[in-house]
Amino acid sequence: MILRSLFNKRFFLIVLCFFVFFPLFALEKQITFDEEKIPGPKELVIYVTANDWGPSVDKIVFNAGKMIDPQKVRTINFEIYREKRMLFNHDRRVDWLEDDLEVSEVYTSDAYGNKIDEASTYLTAYFKYLPESKYASPFTGTILNNVHDIYGYRIINSYLDLEIYSMAGMVNSLAAKFKTSELITSGYKMSYAYYNPPKKNKKRPLIIWLHGISEGGRNPYIALLGIKAVNLASDEIQNCFDEGASVLIPQSPTTWLETTLLDSNGMRIWEPENISGFINRYSGTVKSILSKIISVPLDTPNTVPMAKTSYYTESLMDLIEVFLEQNPNIDRDRIYIGGCSAGGYMTLNMLIEKPGFFAAGIPTCEVYVNTKLSDEEIKILSKVPLWFVQAETDSMAKPSTYVSPTYKRLEGFGAKNLHLTMYKGVFDQTGKYFAEKDDEEDPDMPYEYNGHCSWIYVLNNDPKENGKTIFEWLSEQRR
């Protein structure tokens, strides 16, 4: 989720390659999420599950446009492809990069995917995925996610003379609770998603959740589903608050890590400067391609030590203020902010830059380099109720570089409402997924996620101290 050195040239090359070599992917129309949706003739509806490890397409309900005898439905006869679709030559659709999906079952159903043993125009295809499967997500997963970065799906059965690819919609009951919008601020658009609980007489708090580096762009559903942030609207978390809680999920156009500081080439420096992360996996390929065209310089360490204030600080604050004006039932003394990875950095950044505004913070696997935090900034943070969450196995945001020394300094400044949940690792809690079956001593060892994914625990309301979960604790905090 994070970058190895700031190296803006590297980022420039990645973005350049993306736009030069990969034309704009787009569906025929912009897709939103519904609680339920019925496909019309020759249409399909995608059912997306918000897993701890990310979104997955678990089933597709499609309308054959004719009655289909269940005796003629054989799973082996169906071919289902996940496709990237792009606009080419003035809106002529071209299908590109097909993934052949493994179908576990196809059957006749009602319009909502419930199995029936009689002829129907509706059929349902089921899929099964292992955690973190690259074929599971409905999103194309580009570095900067565009509003249309959703896969198309194509269902083919030559025996039944079927070919269906027109998408009627996508279904996820939690995502359907959220509305999406955009705010033009500082000359560009900032997308966001938000949820308001059913209206009650009392004022309610606001939870602001900030995504990581992989969920930036202009598709707020990626910020919602990419790391299961939709769970903030679940009954389990909403019931921690007497009146429920409003939820605001802003989406950075690029990443919260962009700072106000410019390098010698006039490009914004990213914070932190010397960390490892997923972009390095792309940079080698990008350089090898472009080296045949232009001269690509080697990495050079960044010499600017204090690139730390996010370029999006004021834009995010503008969005928060506008949202508060539009929702006067929100209690301004109970505004909570949290986020993971780059969003954890941005959480601390906002608490420092806007002292006294927020009631509490929950920075998770945060990447604000401790050595960049001045004593004055630590003093500001020490006055804010904080609950840090991290895993010992986090190699991307090593506790020794980030949360551990910061936490100790906060203790030294007398922070009175300070908490840290440090997990041994990040393990599946659902009981559905297990490690490789090569451990004879513990064959039921749960699946272990990357140690950076400690947001899984937070968004499942798992961290607990003195009998209170993290969101129960949050509900008690006031400015």
Q: For the regions a protein language model found, what residue spans apply to each?
A:
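Active-site machinery of serine-nucleophile hydrolases
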Residues: 213-314
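C-terminal catalytic histidine-bearing segment of alpha/beta-hydrolase fold enzymes
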Residues: 387-395, 401-479
